[in-house]
Amino acid sequence: MKITYLDGRRLYYAFISGAREVIANKKELNRINLFPVADGDTGSNLARTLSVVRSEAIKDDSLQNTLDSMGEAALKGAIGNSGIIFAQFINGLKINVDKADSISVDKFARAVEKAVDYTYQGINNPVEGTILTVMKEWSESLKKLKNDSNDFAELMEKSLNYASLSLKNTKNQLAVLKEADVVDSGAQAFVLFLEGIVGFIKNGNLKDLKTEKISEIKSFSEDEIGREEEIKYRYCTEAYLEQLKIEIPELKERVSDLGDSLII
């Protein structure tokens, strides 16, 4: 089926499908979690983050309204580096769809490009070979492919190939991944998210997308690859801020010495 526009309902079902694929693979994502620290919780953190969005997002005809609800839920439910990066990306999309009820392939590609930029800007020290790289290179593929077709189904399927290639290359970009011969866990999660969307477009059934209750998810898998190492900042800390009276750069400067992976 050809899909020439993306509205709120289509986005909602696409997101639910992508989230289900990530959640279904949380144990494997935990197992290969080595960067930024080998704490074996990327899958669990993303499963919790996406489960909150899945349960709290509003399915509306308007793309902007649906994204507004997703962005709010993502920020409040985000856990861990990858969870917060996902939340940043969703909010980047929310900001850049220009209050539209629906958008074309061309406008979607532009919104994704801006959303990726927004995500990078929120990170104090962005590192390549991670979920960020796959997001960026997937976005670049959308820019290339949008001129060939106005069909979202074709765009998503072809761009998934670029994202998959980018994922495979993460093990060549970070020494810790190359040593263990695994890809980046967060990057793998993003590709799984895209695979879930493409799978739904091709073979999906709305009856299969029933929202499930958020279950208790263990933080570690039994067979994780993690190595023995000293972790200076062992725990993630998230804070939801409203009505800031200072600019983002100043806030970053004030809290930059409180950890080694800052995302605002």
Predicted segments — roles?
Residues 1-264:
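N-terminal loops that bind phosphate or other acidic moieties
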